[in-house]
From Swiss-Prot:
Protein name: NADH-ubiquinone oxidoreductase chain 5
Annotated gene: MT-ND5
Domain of life where this protein originates: Eukaryota
Disulfide bond residue pairs: none
Keywords on record: Electron transport, Membrane, Mitochondrion, Mitochondrion inner membrane, NAD, Respiratory chain, Translocase, Transmembrane, Transmembrane helix, Transport, Ubiquinone
Catalytic activity: a ubiquinone + NADH + 5 H(+)(in) = a ubiquinol + NAD(+) + 4 H(+)(out)
Subcellular localization, as worded in the UniProt entry: Mitochondrion inner membrane
Family the UniProt entry places it in: Belongs to the complex I subunit 5 family.
Ubl conjugation in keyword set: no
GO cellular component: mitochondrial inner membrane
GO molecular function: NADH dehydrogenase (ubiquinone) activity
EC number per UniProt: 7.1.1.2
Length: 613
């Protein structure tokens, strides 16, 4: 097949993929609302997935490195802005996986949101969310990338705050916007620097133009942008708060759209940072701190969605560690495998929540394996894949990252933190299995338990297959074809498995202690630190906002009221005149002797003046 034929095939298939996605949104403005519209959206995404398989499989089989399509858009002075689409292994594989996962999530959402009167608008938002992520992934210039970047940001705000009648949902949506705005500053700073110094936003050109430049400033901006969007430590609180949105939103947000956008940005622009040791070290340490801190927070949470949400943040930290190791392909492999089991974990959580009358507290569950066998089996598979159990999807990416950091001569502290976080992953994953699936039911007796609906079963089963075989398939194509290093000792090779087994033993011990504890509410500082998210929200959201409010109150009451209105104002003037007034008030007391004395004194003074003159 010639290059021109390949070009036409790629252009046709990918244009058709995007057109199929855009058509339902376009027709929604023309036609009247229909109960069938959610099914039409689901079928459109399903069809797009099968169409996108053609160029993806072709790209992987022919081992094509990159394929770029240019369209002239507009020009400002000497700067030309093109619609430039880049199709390489990263964009092709990610598009296919995102469409597959979104197809499953939309099918589940038809069941989950069937009672919502605005379900058509909900599906429109989800589809727009997906399209914005597609724009970001395929962009070959910074302006297009910024459009997709802001698109996923605004759609996350609308979807997290979907139940806008709830104060917590509104607060979570605002948190997502505000924290991501901090990250957006970094991306805009990078774009400004690149335009000033290279006069171009074309990504492929930028790599050559910046080769001999000091790229510390734009690389710092990229790291800040990824920190905000991918919820790294410092800008992470919005991610667990985003659990206030509907479960399908959480599944899409955490698997293949919003949160991986920051990591994907660093993967796409990795040549800008690959030779900057300071930025790589910062990314490595930031990722290690994030993965440990969020895994620690997940240990003592009782909301099933919060636990899965914190696990996402922990895995994003692991991806950032891979970026810091100069291994973007490992970070991308983990993005792809993570999408399957994370979406499945959220769908299983949604199925359980609906079956238990919207109950999310794992302490009030139990015995679900008897009443929801399919959901329980898939939840177990997803949890095992998240732990990195051998031969499931998560093993191939997670184990590769831990092997890479084990064999590198980089920061040993980052290695220790990552290994501890890996152990904690096993702890909270098995904690979910223990509390939700095992022992006797702790639920209300009248719970509408039912998973016989194909809208529940089919999406979860599809994602379960992905969680089992995706890692084995993807690692054949994503990992570089080079001679494997055969010098690792068995201990180094088995490190990830060993720490996961330690986590298993720890989880069993904690579960045993939970059944024997005397106090209902643990009072240890370590428990409170984990359960209250390291006190970070209390410090940043309360203390940091309370301090300026108190300062404003003090300046208003003490500085303005007391100083200007009292000390220096009317009361101050009155006080300075008080001493003089007290002295001269004796003259006006109405005593005759006082008046005679004043008169005699006046006569004497006048006489003396006359005699002198």
């Amino acid at each position: 097949m010639s290059i021109s034929q390949l070009s036409q095939m790629f252009m046709t298939c990918l244009s058709l993929t995007m057109i199929i996605l855009i058509l339902p949104i376009t027709f929604s403005f023309i036609t009247k609302p229909s109960n069938k519209w959610p099914f039409q959206v689901k079928n459109a995404v399903k069809l797009s997935f099968f169409v996108s398989l053609i160029p993806s499989i072709t790209c992987l089989n022919l081992n094509l490195q990159s394929f770029t399509i240019y369209y002239q858009w507009f020009s400002i002075s000497s700067t030309k802005i093109n619609i430039s689409l880049q199709f390489d292994q990263y964009s092709m594989i990610f598009m296919t996986i995102a469409l597959y996962v979104t197809w499953s999530i939309l099918e589940f959402a038809i069941y989950y949101m069937h009672t919502d009167i605005l379900i058509n608008r909900f599906f429109k938002y989800l589809l727009t969310f997906l399209i914005a992520m597609m724009i970001l992934v395929t962009a070959n210039n910074m302006f297009q990338l910024f459009i997709g970047w802001e698109g996923v940001g605004i759609m996350s705000f609308l979807l997290i705050g979907w139940w806008y009648g709830r104060a917590d949902a509104n607060m979570a949506a605002l948190q997502a916007v505000i924290y991501n705005r901090v990250g957006d500053i970094g991306l805009m700073m990078t774009m400004s620097w690149l335009l000033i110094n290279t006069n171009s936003w074309d990504i492929q050109q930028l790599f050559g133009l910046t080769k001999n430049m000091d790229t510390t400033l734009p690389a710092t901006g990229l790291l800040l942008a990824a920190t905000g969007k991918s919820a790294q430590f410092g800008l992470h609180p919005w991610l667990p708060a985003a659990m206030e949105g509907p479960t399908p939103v959480s599944a899409l947000l955490h698997s293949s759209t919003m949160v991986v956008a920051g990591i994907f940005l660093l993967i796409r622009l990795h040549p800008l940072i690959e030779n900057n040791n300071n930025i790589l070290t910062a990314a490595l340490c930031l990722g290690a701190i994030t993965t440990l801190f969020t895994a620690t927070c997940a240990l003592t949470q009782n909301d099933i969605k919060k636990i899965v949400g914190f696990s996402t943040s922990s895995q994003l930290g692991l991806m950032m560690v891979a970026i810091g190791l100069n291994q973007p392909q490992l970070a991308f492999l983990h993005i792809c495998t993570h999408a399957f089991f994370k979406a499945m974990l959220f769908l299983c959580s949604g199925s359980i929540i609906h079956s238990l009358n919207d109950e999310q507290d794992i302490r009030k569950m139990g015995g679900i394996n008897k009443t929801l066998p399919l959901t329980s089996s898939c939840l177990t598979i997803g949890s095992l894949a998240l732990m990195g159990t051998p031969f499931l999807a998560g093993f191939f990416s997670k184990d590769a990252i831990i092997e890479a950091i084990n064999t590198s001569h980089l920061n040993a502290w980052a290695l220790v933190l990552t290994l501890i976080a890996t152990s904690f992953t096993a702890v909270y994953s098995l904690r979910i299995i223990y509390f939700v699936l095992m022992n006797h039911p702790r639920t209300l007796p009248l719970s509408p338990v039912n998973e016989n609906n194909p809208l529940i079963a089919n999406p979860i089963k599809r994602l379960a297959w992905g969680s089992i075989i995706a890692g084995l398939i993807l690692c054949q194509y994503i990992l570089p074809n080079k001679t494997q290093t055969l010098t690792m000792t068995p201990m180094l090779k088995l490190t990830a498995l060993i720490v996961s087994l330690l986590g298993l033993l720890t989880a069993l011990e904690l579960a045993s202690m939970a059944n024997k504890q005397i106090k209902i509410n643990p009072t240890k500082f370590t428990h409170n630190f984990s359960n209250m998210l390291g006190f970070y929200p209390h410090i940043m959201h309360r203390l940091m906002s309370k301090l300026p409010l108190m300062l404003g109150q003090i300046s208003a009451t003490q500085m303005s009221d007391q100083l200007w209105m009292e000390k220096l104002g009317p009361k101050g003037i009155a006080h300075t005149q008080l001493l003089v007034t007290q002295k001269i008030t004796h003259v006006h007391k109405g005593l005759i002797k006082t008046y005679l004395s004043i008169m005699m004194l006046s006569i004497i003074i006048i006489t003396i003046i006359i005699m002198i003159t």
